[in-house]
């Protein structure tokens, strides 16, 4: 049959449905002998099934594709509608099709292919070509790339001048990919290999059509001869990122289902219609299960899809399908499972080409093998196209690939069949050793440090061959020549299948997109119900405080002053309802990374995401506002008319919706918390200051009046005031006037008293709501995330590859080392004392978790280590291994004294003396698995800091620096000396460089014993080799080193001298030497009857974990713990423990005069030194704060211009106080909230450094608190001088210094309050929520909204406990408290302040003392909390 032309499919399938129904004698269908019929158990069943099938065949095409025959558990077939398949039915169907993923997947895919082939339908294929591809980026190099305060300012000005073409850019061009060409063929698996920063991710992004527009690209990429602009590449191909970005509140199944619904079914439906038509014409009856599967896979819009279930199964995610994905805040699935969810998210779609970036990070080798194998089957059988980059592929995974692309330094060193790659390198003089994985060899052979060990031409001297030379040699190699010939012949476009390339931008229709996004938003709101409940309760508490503060019995309505108090209450109501929308800011930003990923993958347009997040919040608003109005309205004593009650309710609903829309918009524009909260503060400040309450309209300057008219707050406040003061209770005439009291009050504040202003306000707010939400949608559509990973390049003088060739990693018992490390020849600058560590019968248990008790666990304690014994000696490298949950990290934490809870029994000795944690911390180092370092210091500074605090006091600075230099050489960190550490995954060092820094930070402490937790996890083969070489060099200096290790390659595993193997449940099953090529280990396990022999060339580490698995133990009926306990090895180890457990003659127990190696003062100086660099190089915090302060100062200065000189009426004083009130609140809250993320990041570093015995908590707190003082001082002076001069306060030295003093201490206590918030809570999110609540209370009791004399007696005590009230008291009393000028009503300024606010000038001394006390109180609380609370759980 001719290949199907799928463009005519829909037409042909519908024509088929109108032809006559099946003939009555439909049995003739089954008499076609050439067709394979899947027979059932009995003839009768067959006949019944045939009748049902015949009935199905009579249906019109569209209905026929929606129905199928499903077999029940008894084997009877029933007709089902595809859309009505239940969970159990889908599960049973998959059980029949793919019972065991590894075994049955291929059979299932072949059945699918068989059905398609039988009627001669051709599957679409994609061939991807890239020709002469060059990709360049612009970057700052050397010290200019460090984000110091000065660089930030210089780069900012420079970028501005560049855009105006005044100055040329100082950025250097960096070439990522250099003139590369190649072909990715369908039906073949391509493996992309290359060392870090060789351009793998960039190549994959280029092939998938997802490159960053800022990059300069020349050359072309084409699919089946069509260039990327001729179709939609993002939907034709799927790019799977190496970053796992998911919404933590969704389960694994929900994540995949959402993705499947958004991506749609592609051309599956058309293909099925054509298939069905041809089968009908040829009298072919398909397998019923395959038929149902294909129909379900081709049905759009199903919430629960068979394809999703299938992908979950082959990725091994079916066991955690209903578990939350989780994130930093929510406990969820493991890292390896998250990686698989990222892969599954794209596999559920209809893409024919897959570009997968490092999909195996965090997975064990057997899982990686089974996933890659499933992908291979799918690619080869269903004619897909795949390029997969892997970090450390095991030999068996490597062998699954057909083609290899090897990238190095932006050049393609080799591209072609896997079988020819070794031949190419042998022709260049490099040979892969026998016990070396080919993939590992390929990653190392182009690296300057690793190349020499593979040189095989013994008769020629070795010279380093660059990536460029390899790339040139490849062109003349036979594989390269063949590729060149193929590229010379263009792809024949006429052979491109019409269904191969996608032209629609989205997978489903607009209505369906909106439905899918709405359902997800609803689900997330349910999952986040805690946030909404928390907001409700916070609002309830504030409502209770507000109504008891403005209690009706305490609120007369006789004078304009009384009206002013009511106006204050209404103003506060508007503020509360507006600021309650602020949580939208954080929630929007939190979801942005996932949104950007899904938007760029064309899952949905931005409007489909924006509309549900607006519409679904309306019911929340109704509840919040309803709660507030019902609680406060009548208790405060607002106008009792029910219409006015409902009008206030309506107005506040619109206010809340407007605020939520505004915060969403700000979040989408700001994109990070820092920028958004700064922008948010600006927007709020302008609204707040120009809302007509803080500064009366009559006093707004002409150049700011536009701000007054566009401030949503003005409309809100005006409407709510009119609604209240237009009521009956306020319509009596004021004595000596001709206006009602209500009208007078509204006018005195500069508002409009006419009743129609209520509706003007409501209308304006509705308009703002629509505009903000529309702009939110636009911002989502057109803005991209800020943070891009960036590399720090050395300047030309500092060549990155300046290290000489280091030794190969080998174990001490005789590996084939080519050149020994130099460190053996010369001793280190600082001597150290070698120590052994022995532990005998160590038991570790924790209290039984509540969940396990509920499941029926009877014991009180859960035992994690069951009597473990062993000895670690100097100069011996020990690997601590076992399956997940065996207790490797637990044992290490117990030995290192890092556990914060639980019960430890048994004896641990150091060189024969019982271990004391205080002294042990001084001679030991612990390299944690997650590399935690201060992000804003350089590599060299990190090491100097660690050495400064951990080496003894008698080591002078010169020796210390020499020692640091030695360690840097040992760990090969020389070229990165001035590189900034940075935040993981955002900027700074790569994973492998961070690992080496972690090791170096411990080494500079000159420890005798070092523990390392998974030093090679998440690294590629080359990086792992560098880290292991570092570890080996460390052991060769005579130290005791223990590493937990997970899935090592052969050469990493055999670099160890001894193995400590544990099984699940915390018991040891082998403790002893490995031997050459692991001979001792293999001999020990093979001597057990029934244990499978190791295959030639197989990895002993993998084999050992396989043969000791609990399933194997059950099968063989042996317990490896018992086997070990009865072996000679165990007895030998016990003898060794006894021998090392006795102190050597003449030795002394470890003893140090002090707990820390440095004095308290030195600790303080060192902590302050590190904080200094951390702040200086963090412009996102320090520079933004200064810019923000300067802007606010200029805004206030121009807004309240020259108001300080006006003191003719009471409103002037209220305006002046308003300027102080707004400034204090905004600057203070901005300081408090912006310091929190900085402190939160440093706190995690503090936990590691304190555990290492570097310093006590007080010096750390001292450094953190002290470094703020100069920055805040400059901030106060900046602000003070600008504002004082522009507002025109009296130029009196005393008053000016009072102003500066109060501003300085106010900003200090706000900043320390923010720091304290972090110190007393487990994480930054909780800290910001707790802190925010108090800002609201402080605002209410500050004395501006309701002065102290008007507060009810039962609340006055809180006025005195409120720091903001003291600040306002000080600012107003110092400026105006002694002025004798008369106001319009014959009262002096001094008398008015005493009567109305209760402010006295002679009370300033007390104010100063109280403000100072607040600063000390918050700083001390911070220090105490840091010392007392440890929120790290181990």
From Swiss-Prot:
Biased composition (Polar residues): 804-824
Any one of the GO CC terms: membrane
SMART domains the record matches: AAA
InterPro entries xref list: AAA+_ATPase, ABC2_TM, ABC_trans_N, ABC_transporter-like_ATP-bd, ABCG_dom, ABCG_PDR_1, ABCG_PDR_2, P-loop_NTPase
Domain ABC transporter: from-to ranges: 161-434, 837-1089
Membrane-crossing segments per the record: 530-550, 563-583, 618-638, 649-669, 675-695, 702-722, 760-780, 1181-1201, 1221-1241, 1269-1289, 1296-1316, 1326-1346, 1357-1377, 1406-1426
Domain ABC transmembrane type-2: 512-725, 1162-1376
Keyword Cell membrane carried by entry: no
Region (Disordered), start-end ranges: 1-22, 793-824
Domain of life: Eukaryota
Membrane topology: Multi-pass membrane protein
Upregulating conditions: By the phytohormone methyl jasmonate (MeJA), defense elicitors (INF1 elicitin of P.infestans, flagellin of P.syringae and yeast extract), and protein phosphatase inhibitor (cantharidin). Repressed by protein kinase inhibitor (K252a) and cycloheximide.
Pfam families: ABC2_membrane (PF01061), ABC2_membrane_7 (PF19055), ABC_tran (PF00005), ABC_trans_N (PF14510), PDR_assoc (PF08370)
GO MF annotations in UniProt: ABC-type transporter activity; ATP binding; ATP hydrolysis activity
Binding site for ATP 1: 194-201
Keyword field contains Glycosyltransferase: no
Cellular compartments annotated: Membrane
Record keywords: ATP-binding, Membrane, Nucleotide-binding, Repeat, Transmembrane, Transmembrane helix, Transport
Residues at which ATP 2 binds: 882-889
Family: Belongs to the ABC transporter superfamily. ABCG family. PDR (TC 3.A.1.205) subfamily.
Name the UniProt record assigns to this protein: Pleiotropic drug resistance protein 1
Gene: PDR1
